[in-house]
Every structure is written in structure tokens, then in C-alpha cells.
Amino acid sequence: MLDSCSGPNYCTPNPNCSGQPAVMAVSGSPVITDNNFTLTANQLPLNEWGYFLMSESQGFIPNVGGSSGNLCLGFPFYRFNNASNGTGKVLFSGSGGTFSFSPDLTNLPQNVTFMIGETWNFQAWSRDCKGSTSNFTDGIEVMFR
């Protein structure tokens, strides 16, 4: 179970087509060498696609790119959506409205490397069933050791 290196969730998400806002959770260990860390997005629209994002900084851009949600990360941010090189994959929320991903902390997007003592922020993006739009979860920060 993740210890106190995980801060509280931040950045209020907008409700998606389920009527609920989607929320982030993390589990596992913030110890980089353990390589046992899982991101989970809950209360997503059913049967929709999405992926996780990360950034060293927090931000707030409402309805970014015409979405129904708020981007809670600062720039630059990185996407866990490239299955071809093992740094991520596009995920499916299924009938439970949730998806999880356990990144390889030694093979992060765009050659990012987590350093001991750094704080990183995570958020999930997903399609929303309200027409041709998308939405985001809230954000969560984690200090790695």
C-alpha cells in the first residue's frame, strides 16, 4: 500500500456522462527500485478508452482542447499511451467504469527518469459518452523515494 508519499487528490474534476466526476487513486510503493506502482482511474464513463498522464508540476486549464474536463497538470506533461515501446497503453474502462496501469518505473515515456525525492503528478484522460468529447479525472501527486 502506498505510504504518506502520496498527497491528497487535487483539482476538482467535472462530472462525466455517468453524472459523477472520475477520480484518481494510486497503490503500491513510491520506492523507485521496488517498481511496484499502480495508477487507477475510477468512476469513468462505461466502455470508453483513455490513458494516464504525468507531469512534475500541477496546473489548471478548464475544458482544454474542447473537452468537458480540466487538465490539472502543468507543462510539459507526458502520456502513458505508447504500447509499441512499452511505456504505456490505451486502456478500456469496461462495464465497471475503471482502468488501471502499472508503469515500469525504469521505462517511462520520452525517457523521463524519476529521481529520489521528486514529486510527480498523475491524471487520467478518457473519452466521454457525451457526443464527441473527452474528460479528465482529478489529479494526484506522489513523491518518489
Where are these regions (language model features)?
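Residue-level hotspots within well-ordered secondary structure
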Residues: M1-R145
